[in-house]
A protein has these predicted regions:
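A generic transmembrane-helix signature of 12-TM secondary carrier transporters
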Residues: 5-6, 73, 79-80, 242, ...
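Hydrophobic transmembrane architecture of multi-pass small-molecule transporters
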Residues: 311-410, 416-426
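Cytoplasmic loop-to-transmembrane helix junctions
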Residues: 32-40, 292-302, 386
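Hydrophobic transmembrane-helix bundles of small-molecule transporters
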Residues: 62-180, 187
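Helix-loop-helix hairpins in multi-pass membrane proteins, especially solute transporters
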Residues: 1-105
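Alpha-helical transmembrane segments of multi-pass secondary-active solute transporters
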Residues: 37, 67-72, 133-137, 205, ...
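12-transmembrane solute porter fold
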Residues: 159-328
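Small-residue (Gly/Pro/Ala) motifs that create kinks and tight helix-helix packing interfaces
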Residues: 48-60, 64, 120, 223, ...
């Protein structure tokens, strides 16, 4: 039921986003300059998402978690009421043929993507090939996606044109935006650090992520004036955006420890927001620079799939699986040295044992509490070591990409020459 409802919400969200873009263009960019519009649009989209998560966390913290859903239901009912009262019903000029709705193509690509996402998300949990569902979806998902591509390549009136996939700039843009979302999703590692090591609750975790908002604002401001002036090479902007991720990973790699503070994370979160939005806006413009305006909706289709669907779920699955594997590796490594012959381990164990006995626990129960205390310490240490290793690799990769991007000849400058912004949802 949840999957079906989420699918319906996403389906309707596409129409709402298209409607919002059509009217927001007139407000944010009366002259229909794409770079100016994106500098307003993307901060609103990503900033609104962060703000909504904070509001729901505050409601769940201060009230019963059910009230959060009651609040959302009330807002939805109010929105429906406004639509009924204020929106004018525009009758279609002509009847739309059933074949023009492309129901078959929508079903095929939706089913294929849902199965692919299920495999990526639950493959490790269900032990991959030991699960019948995973085996079936691994076979069916690529077949459905290939069938969808075959339909579009042979259709005279395709549901989605494949033209953007043959544009080099569009492919480079999709690739870089997937990298950006892969790096940005690394905040899942930070969430583990906050909850396990610093013992921070959900509300304060989401409050920390509000420091992304100043980064979004600064990134949008930089892009607005960078593309208006167009005095510097495009690769300098990309290298600068990647350097923000270098700073983000460097501060986390050298800064996280059991003695670190919550406030220490404000600055890296800011740089993550700055780098993310700068690169998202830059490559959203770069991907459509040489694209025929009639393919803008097709570009939006592929951009949303690569940037907002596949990249986050791939990154989340990778980080969670890598963190679990490395944590188990370091847990085994550290536990080998935990014996009574080790002075530090023996001291910690005896201290916990004596404290439990002093509190009135029987010896057997006190011994169990002391063992659990030592186990929790090992868990924290293994998590820290696993985080350090992953963040170290991410730091090196981001440095390499930042340096390479500095010398990639994207072009001398990016010239935004479109007369109209277009009805796309990127």
């Amino acid at each position: 039921i949840l999957i079906v409802c989420s699918f319906a919400v996403g389906f309707l969200k596409g129409f709402l986003m298209l409607w919002f873009i059509r009217y927001a263009q007139k407000i944010f960019s009366p002259k229909n300059v794409r770079s100016e519009f994106y500098s307003y649009f993307y901060p609103l989209v990503y900033g609104g998402g962060q703000a909504s998560m904070l509001v729901t966390a505050l409601l769940a913290y201060h009230y019963n978690w059910k009230y959060m859903y009651y609040f959302m239901m009330v807002l939805i009912l109010i929105s429906i009421l406004f639509v009924i009262i204020c929106f004018r019903h525009n009758r279609p000029i002509k009847v739309v043929a059933w074949s023009d709705l492309h129901i078959r193509e929508m079903f095929v690509i939706s089913a294929g993507l849902l199965m692919l996402m299920y495999v990526i998300n639950y493959g490790k949990v269900l032990d991959w090939m030991a699960s019948g569902k995973i085996c079936a979806y691994i076979i069916i998902a690529p077949m459905l996606i290939a069938l969808f591509i075959w339909y579009q390549s042979r259709s005279e009136n395709p549901y989605v044109s494949l033209a953007p996939l043959f544009q080099p700039k569009a492919i480079i843009g999709y690739f870089y935006m997937m990298l950006v979302m892969f790096f940005s999703t690394s905040t899942t590692l930070l969430t583990n650090y906050l909850t396990v090591i610093l013992k921070v609750d959900t509300t304060h975790t989401y409050s920390l992520y509000t420091y992304l908002l100043p980064g979004y604002v600064v990134g949008a401001f930089i892009c607005f004036w960078w593309f208006r002036w167009q005095r510097w090479r495009f690769r300098f902007l990309i290298a600068g955006g990647m350097s923000c991720f270098v700073i983000f990973f460097a501060i986390l790699y050298f800064g996280i420890s059991p003695d670190s503070t919550y406030e220490m994370l404000y600055l890296p979160i800011f740089f993550r927001g700055l780098g993310m939005l700068t690169l998202i806006i830059a490559f959203a413009l770069f991907a459509v620079e040489d694209l025929n305006p009639k393919y803008l909706l097709s570009n939006a289709f592929f951009l949303i799939i690569f940037r907002s669907v596949l990249a986050p779920i791939l990154a989340t699955s990778f980080y969670s699986n890598a963190l679990y594997r490395l944590q188990q590796k370091y847990m085994y490594f550290l536990s080998e040295t935990i014996t009574t012959a080790d002075p530090l381990s023996a001291t910690r164990y005896n201290q916990s044992l004596n404290n439990a006995i002093t509190q009135g626990h029987p010896y057997n129960e006190a011994a169990q509490l002391a063992t659990n205390s030592l186990y929790n310490t090992l868990q924290q240490q293994s998590l820290l070591l696993a985080l350090k290793e992953i963040l170290g690799y991410l730091l090196v990769i981001s440095v390499v990409i930042a340096v390479v991007s500095r010398f990639i000849p994207f072009h001398k400058t990016i010239r935004v020459t479109f007369k109209r912004t277009g009805d796309d949802m990127v």
